[in-house]
């Protein structure tokens, strides 16, 4: 028996050491944690249970095979809640994916889905394992299939802590959220050398697919961190807002509160910018707002927060950037977030101060019509509780797109200063009273007078409230309490839709 035990411990040690002590040391010298260190830091203390540590490639020669085949898989807890996690081990074949490597990931994904718990992938891989040829590509296909199959069933989170190139990038792209470590995390389909050879363009890996690029330019990633530990801490925080799966909700007791500061945060002058995140923080429970994609499409803000201890998703116009107008990227950013919240029964709050869709030739030529329609589609198809708070401007088609009553909002509140109209009062007055303004002895004075007249008669919140497009006009300071009450009332909302296979969102 002792001989068997000794053999077991030897094999276990081999599995835990991955590519060996020398390669583990090299990993740390690059400022990177090892695969197992990452898992240990991410999960609750002593909660990780490994699965399939002794699996190895059945394709490579005996001399080439290594226990675990370059990926550590298993389950544990985060804040006491079950999660499933895999971590690619760069010290084994450079983390390259082969048949067995893929089988381990697929088995874990299936297990996570059966048990209705989130899955987290810690990516650090050189890509497909060339030695295994098409078997590696087939492995990617099986992973992609499960990413799609379990989308909306369990939360899927990707963490890019090293290279992620070629076909490997499509699995993270199919998941719900992507975190990236600065300096070490990189994603691209074709690397710098291939690009230079094919197109003649010269670029380094960081400028092509680093965390900064994907968080601010491409919009492929949602979060970044200076260190791996900062990134993994962010994953833990994100999960605290999410249900285990798309079939569970966790209602919490309501709490009333008054926030007088809200009376002073939004300038009365509709042309003056301000940071809507200050408004969000006053509406939400203290220190609960968790922004997503803060560096991409800054003219719209998305994120999670708690309202009376209940987790909600927030979509908000950001007047600090482009006056809060809707653009192609803003519409895409918000639409994807709305669909995630709907898939996992997370209520939605829309904080609106929108002057319209951004005018411009590039916006039109690049498809603002189609992209704006995605936002409309996402709001209209969502059946979770949906509440809108209009805090200043709500103009034109953008007003309709930002969760208006017409496309399915359950409740719409407006502040007394809100302006809800086909267009801004100045533009409307210029059209309606064009002849009168031109004939006036003082056109500028007449224009100001007509603008004020139009604003008073047509653009205030009372006209919309009289037509039933606004459910109530409320004071800024009472908004938090009213929103808590609204979401509490909507806790058991059910909404039947026509039966169909699926809609055709304008991709």
UniProtKB/Swiss-Prot annotation:
Residues 1-501 are annotated as: Carboxyltransferase. Its EC number is 6.4.1.3. Signal peptide: none annotated. One of its GO terms (molecular function) is ATP binding. Pathway: Metabolic intermediate metabolism; propanoyl-CoA degradation; succinyl-CoA from propanoyl-CoA: step 1/3. Residues 256-501 form the CoA carboxyltransferase C-terminal domain. InterPro entries: AccD/PCCB (IPR051047), AcCoA_carboxyl_beta (IPR034733), Acetyl_CoA_COase_Trfase_b_su (IPR000438), ClpP/crotonase-like_dom_sf (IPR029045), COA_CT_C (IPR011763), COA_CT_N (IPR011762). Residues 1-30 are annotated as: Disordered. Residues 1-254 form the CoA carboxyltransferase N-terminal domain. Probably a dodecamer composed of six biotin-containing alpha subunits and six beta subunits. Belongs to the AccD/PCCB family. This is Putative propionyl-CoA carboxylase beta chain. The gene is yqjD.
């Amino acid at each position: 028996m002792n001989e068997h035990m000794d053999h077991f411990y030897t094999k276990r040690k081999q599995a835990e050491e991955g590519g060996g002590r020398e390669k583990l040391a090299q990993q740390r010298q690059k400022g990177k944690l090892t695969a197992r260190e990452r898992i240990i830091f991410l999960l609750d203390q002593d909660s990780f249970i490994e699965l399939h540590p002794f699996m190895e490639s059945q394709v490579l020669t005996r001399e080439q095979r290594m226990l675990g085949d370059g990926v550590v898989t298993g389950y544990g807890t985060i804040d006491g809640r079950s999660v499933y996690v895999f971590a690619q081990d760069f010290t084994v074949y450079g983390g390259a994916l082969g048949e067995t490597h893929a089988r381990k990931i697929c088995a874990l994904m299936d297990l996570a889905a059966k048990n209705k718990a989130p899955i987290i992938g810690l990516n650090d891989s050189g890509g497909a394992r060339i030695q295994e040829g098409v078997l590696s590509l087939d492995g990617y296909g099986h992973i992609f299939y499960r990413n799609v199959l379990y989308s909306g069933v369990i939360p899927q989170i990707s963490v890019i802590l090293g290279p992620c190139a070629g076909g490997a990038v499509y699995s993270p792209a199919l998941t719900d959220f992507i975190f990236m470590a600065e300096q070490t995390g990189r994603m691209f389909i074709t690397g710098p050398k291939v690009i230079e050879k094919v197109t003649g363009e010269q670029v380094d890996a960081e400028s092509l697919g680093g965390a900064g690029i994907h968080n601010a330019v491409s919009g492929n990633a949602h979060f970044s961190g200076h260190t791996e530990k900062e990134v993994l801490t962010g994953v833990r925080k994100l999960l605290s807002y999410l249900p285990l799966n798309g079939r569970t909700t966790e209602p919490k007791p309501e709490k009333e509160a008054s926030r007088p500061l809200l009376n002073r945060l939004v300038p009365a002058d509709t042309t003056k910018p301000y940071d809507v995140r200050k408004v969000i923080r006053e509406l939400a429970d203290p220190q609960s707002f968790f922004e997503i994609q803060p560096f991409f499409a800054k003219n719209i803000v998305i994120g999670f927060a708690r309202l009376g201890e209940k987790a909600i998703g927030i979509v908000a116009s950001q007047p600090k950037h482009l006056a809060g107008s809707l653009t192609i990227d803003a519409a895409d950013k918000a639409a994807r977030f709305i669909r995630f919240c709907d898939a996992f029964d997370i209520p939605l709050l829309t904080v609106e101060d929108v002057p319209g869709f951004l005018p411009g030739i590039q916006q039109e030529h690049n498809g603002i019509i189609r992209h704006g329609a995605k936002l409309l589609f996402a709001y209209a198809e969502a059946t979770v509780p949906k509440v809108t708070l209009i805090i200043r401007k709500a103009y034109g088609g953008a007003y309709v797109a930002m969760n208006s009553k017409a496309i399915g909002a359950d409740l719409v509140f407006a502040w007394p200063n809100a302006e809800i109209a086909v267009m801004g009062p100045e533009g409307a007055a210029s059209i309606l009273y064009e002849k009168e303004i031109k004939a006036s002895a003082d056109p500028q004075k007449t224009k100001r007078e007509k603008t004020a007249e139009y604003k008073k008669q047509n653009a205030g919140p009372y006209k919309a409230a009289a037509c039933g497009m606004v459910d109530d006009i409320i004071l800024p300071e009472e908004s938090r309490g009213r929103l808590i009450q609204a979401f509490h009332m909507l806790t058991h909302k059910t909404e039947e839709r026509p039966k169909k296979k699926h809609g055709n969102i304008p991709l």
